[in-house]
UniProtKB/Swiss-Prot annotation:
Modifies, by uridylylation and deuridylylation, the PII regulatory proteins (GlnB and homologs), in response to the nitrogen status of the cell that GlnD senses through the glutamine level. Under low glutamine levels, catalyzes the conversion of the PII proteins and UTP to PII-UMP and PPi, while under higher glutamine levels, GlnD hydrolyzes PII-UMP to PII and UMP (deuridylylation). Thus, controls uridylylation state and activity of the PII proteins, and plays an important role in the regulation of nitrogen assimilation and metabolism. The gene is glnD. Residues 1-324 are annotated as: Uridylyltransferase. PROSITE patterns: ACT, HD. Residues 682-761, 790-858 form the ACT domain. This is Bifunctional uridylyltransferase/uridylyl-removing enzyme. It comes from the Bacteria. The keyword Amino-acid biosynthesis does not apply.
Amino acid sequence: MSASVAEPPPALSRKAEFKAAKAELLARFKSANHVTPLMHALSRATDDALRSLWQECGLPATLALVAVGGFGRGELSPHSDVDILVLLPDAHASELDERIERFIGMAWDLGLEIGSSVRTVDQCIEEASHDVTVQTSLLEARRIVGSTALFERFMLRYREALDARAFFQAKVLEMRQRHAKFQDTPYSLEPNVKESPGGLRDLQTILWIARAAGFGSSWRELDTRGLITDREARELRRNEGFLKTLRARLHVIAGRRQDILVFDLQTQAAESFGYQPTSAKRASEQLMRRYYWAAKAVTQLATILIQNIEAQLFPATSGVTRVLSPGRFVEKQGMLEIAADDVFERHPDAILEAFLLYEATRGVKGLSARTLRALYNSRDVMNNAWRRDPRNRHTFMQILQQPEGITHAFRLMNQTSVLGRYLLNFRRIVGQMQHDLYHVYTVDQHILMVLRNIRRFAVAEHAHEYPFCSQLIVNFERPWVLYVAALFHDIAKGRGGDHSALGMADARRFCREHGIEGDDAALVVWLVQHHLTMSQVAQKQDTSDPVVIKRFAELVGSERRLTALYLLTVADIRGTSPKVWNTWKGKLLEDLYRATLAVLGGAQPDAHSELKTRQEEALALLRLETVPPDAHRALWDQLDVGYFLRHDAADIAWQTRVLYRHVAADTAIVRARPSPVGDALQVLVYVKDRSDLFAGICAYFDRNGLSVLDARVNTTRHGYALDNFIVTQTEHDVQYRDIANLVEQQLAARLAESAPLPEPSKGRLSRLSRTFPITPRVDLRADERGQYYILSVSANDRPGLLYSIARVLAEHRVGVHAARINTLGERVEDVFMLDGTGLSDNRLQIQVETELLRAIAV
């Protein structure tokens, strides 16, 4: 008896055949990197498969199978949805429904992501009249198989019903709403290649609008129509090709539909384009810069095209409103319009004048398409001679010195690439991503955000946001000096080396070329050099130490420099990420500013005089709260000078009021209150000291989702710990007043236990930290006086990190005197002041450092 091999089921065979054909096309794409042939070939293969299924299901010739959407265009990415319409005649037999369902099911079985609709012609027209999404998908309908007559009747009815003006308005509104979901910027850390501003959807929207208006359905046709130039058409094709290729590569790498350029895939995507890491830039950063440049160009050209199409569909009834610059610029319907197409060629100095007029002229809300196009096509005019022209340098300084509109003008200069062509080093950082785990903007966007933040300090409507900064900038002469410093503080990022030092040289050259002299030039250069210093001192050093304040005051040297650095620092931190700034950091910086200002004003930073002042202020507050006159003495006699220097009068008064009756308490006293500083909880712990106390408190905070911002640890003369913590709960919208009692009860109960310290939890890293891990660093050294040891820790942030550090210190009986927890987005840079007892032993130092590195490792 001979064995026979069973034939595979037809459906299985067809699926395997289709899968093999698709795999061959993808392999060809990987080697040849031509995306258009791939998309067309995938569409043809899908057409063939659907025709075969249609015939197998015995669907009659009176029906039509229609491709719509991207499939209708004949453009399928490797894992795109396949959108189809089964077009029915007005009258059809009910048994057809079963066959249509079978056809759609078999298409799914084939491995296609089918999006299907089954409608008559009348139903299609009715749906399209109510839903612009349906109307859009039908715009590119293409017959695959079935009745040609039915399909042509449908297309005729569709075109008759299509209102080009209404369609334009609906699609532009839809685009604006879509852009708003992405904060109106293409510069997202993880952009959606299809949907983000400047992505493929913007290009498709323009072609849909043009097709609906009868202007053409390709860049070549729009060029022929005069809506774009040859150069613009080439630029659009080039960037469209890049975006399509990037999307296809994302699909191939992920093995599924993947339109978001997530961190996990950025490196692989970059390598697929041939990018290699350098000493200054990761491969992923190079790819992202290419993407941002493409998205920026698409955004700019889309603005021009949409305005041009709008002008054709809605001819203006009024002409020039007023002449703004004779022979150069006019205002037309609220837009700045060039007087002639060759204005910038004949008058290159008019390029910057356009932005000055936009900034200074009330009622002008933007640049017209004609002006934008002329700027776009004047790139060759913006050369070295143009940059050196004294008229342009004067105009640039005028733009910086206007009383309002500066932020908008600089954003527009960047969007049109004029800023990068005037400041060549700025051009180098346009689209430069910063994978440092706390900047969420590209370098150019960060710089403009810092400029915007400084400007907001000076705007009365925003004075409530940062009242102290607004108060300072009102009396700051020539605030444009700060704007120049903002432009240059990070301009040397990505070059390798110290960006502050490199930026100083750029700033010095700019000042020399633009007539900024004397103290103003010196201030600009000094600010660029030291733009990180104030935040480092405030967040990493013991600012209760008079020596620290005196040293910082000597560096600053004057009140004007101090104010300038403070304003730039606040604006800089706020411009990194919405997550990085908090009111606690604001307090640290303001305290440092005020302490330094006092020294610059002649005050001597003397510990004993400061001690006396703090105590007098605290006693005055205690009297207001009706605490008996000498009640404080029992507690204060047990406290050293360091305690009074590290706490302000309000905290001293609060802690004294809580503790003066319980100086020798047998049980832990825990009190919590909403922090007077802002969105945080202040927690006071008073209990007999023990070596694992700090770690135990951190364990409680960790288990309850509370992040420590600051810890001030004190040991009284009679052996009690008097510790003060500032904590936040960032994961949830919490009212700290509501959880204060719970924290008091739970933490007091936890401290009453004698249980050993729990094992630290290895909290999950964020995707950003997993993709861009930083090398953990631990530095342990004696302070300048030899009284304490300073422990500096740098690592990826994760839940449980602080407790992991505290547990290692507790295991080696190393006491924590103070802690500054500095969270910068996805990374931490923490500083601890440790009791020096025992750490003078080099072997113990090495052991502690080794175990800390192991504890904080990813």
